[in-house]
């Protein structure tokens, strides 16, 4: 309904997320979780969906995970130190895959 001044507020419908990337911390516990926006999760030291500003082994824009035609790709964005499995371009990911970037261990969770 309208607000107190009879103003109606509208917004775009929320798109459902298709996957999440979860940081694993000491002891195997879940840490930070980033859900996909526009079928992409960006990972880096700054201006990313998952930011790790203290990780000197992580590039500013290190890598991203993207959903593409029902598969999931890990794309290295020209990082200086690469990933646990060096990705020169892209690599398909599936639910439960682990990725190591800088000093961060992440798990991909497909929810769609």
Residue ranges and their predicted role:
Residues 32-103:
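Forkhead-associated
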